[in-house]
Amino acid sequence: MKFTNCREPLFLFLFAVLVTTLFSTCSFLYPLNPWDDANVYMTIGNAMLGGKELYVDIFDHKGPVLYLMHEMAAVLSRNSFVGIYLIEIICVFCFMRYSLRTMRLFSTSKATLPLACLLGWVTASSDLFYYGDSVEEFSLPILAHSLYFMLRFARNRQVPSRWQALVMGVGVGLIFWTKFNILFFYVGGIAALALIAWRHSQMKELGQTVLWVIAGWAVTTAAVLSYFAIHGTIEALMESYFMVNIFQYHGTATNGEPDFWWFPLMKLGIWAVLTIPVCLVRARWEVKALLLGTYGVLLLSFATMTVQFYYFLLMYTFAPMLIYLFRNLKPSLRTYVTIGLVGFAAAATNWNLVTLINGTFPKSVLEMAEIINADKSDDSEVLTFSSYDTGIYQHTRHLPPNKNFFISSILDPEIKKEQAEWVESGKVKYLVREIGAIVTCHEYYDAPIPENYRCIYDKEELFRYRLITTPHKFLWNLTYPRVLLRYVMEPVTVNQRMLIYRREP
């Protein structure tokens, strides 16, 4: 099949629509996004649209770009993730597009287009994609774009144009003001590029490119700082984003996995795990240096934090390098390998689609919202008490009543104190609580329900559902011996308990 320059991007875009629709719970196929983090982002976006000041009237520790994006999404729909769904489609498309360009740096095979589609499918269907709407997902196309131009320089000594470098810098700025520790990718990359440029007497060209990248970063930074300067909240930005993340946020109260050395092996997936060994065997030294710099430093950066498994979605940035496998296959074998990979991708279905099909998708929040929405009184304020955001604010007419409207992974006694004061003040009629899925038994979350609140809703439901019938999950599970027998014997479910407490006269 021949594709013109116009048809190929259109094909990739339509494929991005397909995989995003199937696997992201932000799409119209799903009644809601049950992930706590995504609900926090959307709640803050709604609150900002409703007039609350970020980091002053409402708080979470991520960067402002993430919440500004969700504020824009809230303009389209306050009660759904349709705006985020559209952004996800663009992100998946850009990721596939630049992954395809990366593969074509190393191969002229016609297999590059189906492989790019295959990569898009496997990435979106991966457990690492989670429910959709993660910082890592939005960073993936930016990293793929940067890796393409870095590899083009490493392989062909071709520097980006000023415009290309400026766009790359804007992407760096977006990441910087969303989750700055992802920038370790660029730290290793710049070090490797400097070595390559020095060996090939191109330090001047590289220096000029870096200056244009910095200029792009400055454009994004100026836009962000201007927004907060207009609102008079720059000090709150610096305190809440930089100081909190550097000195307070450690994720110790969540289900993060501290065992750094084996955890990546379990969750990276076949694509990313095979990438670096293949490249180290087949690639020239410049490509090896760049991949070791970007991949290695980014991976090592995870050792500085408590690791959530979906952080490793970033490693799919390097999966296009598997084109080396196809370069060295006999033409007669490429067709069979492609067919096998297509079969593998078809089996690689994450739990979102599985639960939607079998009717176990978690949606008790909709029932909870129906109960609260039936209360037409003026004193029906809602607070997610001593737990993460359940998504209740998206499905009711309410905005969070206070700054710390949920309990995060920041173990700050002041957050608990503020919640307790709001409850004691009598201003909150409904307390919504989630137990079991994300929050561990850490004592920080063990806050007693006041005696004047009565439970009016209590339901346990599925939060996560894992199958062992798909090849990639079975191989991942082999690296997790403590639960191997349980995975092999039966599907593993992770349940959550959803509760509503109402204040009694």
Per-region residue spans from a language model:
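Membrane-interface transmembrane helices that cradle and orient dolichyl/undecaprenyl
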Residues: 144-167, 201, 271-287, 327
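Short periplasmic/luminal acceptor-recognition loop of GT-C membrane glycosyltransferases, typified by
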Residues: 357-442
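Membrane-interface alpha helices of multi-pass inner-membrane proteins
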Residues: 162-182, 186-191, 219, 295-303
